[in-house]
């Protein structure tokens, strides 16, 4: 793949600001795919970007199968220029079914602490349609790693969503102070596991000027404060309820148009 690799050193609390600045200032070629590590982060980032009139969709583990397929279809058709996707290695969900943000998976249901609502989930959602693996994201020009990938293999897998079919691509990774050792290990080991990356190098992303970011800081911090845990939790519940209602309609659509669903796998 013909990919240019960049890093942006940023404090964790400034990731929302820097991601918004990249997209708002038009520094990322469309379409762009933003990888995060938690469903809550995906929802919060989507809500945050919407406040700046940046329309995007979010793809994460808690959405019904048919809704995921529909969201991916819209992204591939160009309805959205930006997609936020939860990476395969999702720390927010552990082995006993606990989910980040105060919910718990019991069988095929999501139980939320906020309302006690039981939200039915497609029982085969993760087995048949993983958020990232096996999905064909079409014509992605830029990958943004909002959260630093866990290792070199994960990095290659995520940035490999761009630069396909002979096209050029760009990968931008946010590196917080706690991620410095992780990104150093990624840079060291990538040539060992990818024969095409012998000349691999992570370069500073210099197109984003500090003064341009700072000009957006005041409003960004004000907006970020308004999207706390409670707001994310409420949005998460509303989103899942809405998508579950839509899921039956989408299931009927895909049953009538099986070719559309098969193209997404």
Model-identified regions with their sequence ranges:
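Structural motif
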Residues: 33-37, 59, 174
């Amino acid at each position: 793949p013909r990919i240019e690799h960049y890093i942006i050193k940023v404090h964790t609390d400034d990731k929302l600001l820097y991601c918004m600045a990249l997209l708002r200032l038009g520094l990322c070629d469309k379409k762009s795919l933003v990888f995060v590590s938690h469903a809550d982060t995906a929802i919060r980032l989507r809500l945050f970007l919407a406040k700046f009139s940046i329309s995007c969709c979010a793809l994460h583990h808690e959405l019904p199968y048919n809704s995921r397929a529909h969201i991916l279809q819209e992204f591939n058709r160009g309805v959205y220029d930006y997609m936020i996707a939860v990476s395969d290695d999702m720390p927010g969900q552990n082995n006993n079914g606990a989910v980040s943000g105060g919910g718990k998976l019991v069988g095929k249901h999501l139980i939320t602490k906020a309302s006690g609502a039981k939200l039915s989930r497609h029982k085969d959602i993760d087995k048949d349609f993983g958020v990232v693996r096996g999905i064909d994201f079409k014509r992605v020009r830029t990958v943004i790693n909002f959260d630093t990938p866990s290792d070199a293999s994960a990095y290659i897998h995520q940035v490999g969503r761009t630069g396909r079919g002979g096209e050029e691509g760009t990968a931008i990774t946010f590196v917080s102070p706690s991620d410095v050792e992780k990104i150093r290990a990624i840079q060291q080991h990538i040539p060992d596991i990818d024969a095409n990356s012998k000349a691999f190098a992570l370069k500073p992303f210099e197109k984003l000027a500090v003064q341009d970011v700072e000009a957006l800081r005041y409003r960004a911090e004000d907006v970020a404060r308004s999207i706390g845990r409670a707001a994310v939790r409420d949005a998460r519940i509303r989103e899942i309820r809405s998508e579950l209602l839509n899921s039956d309609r989408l299931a009927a659509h895909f049953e009538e148009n099986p070719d559309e669903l098969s193209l997404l796998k």
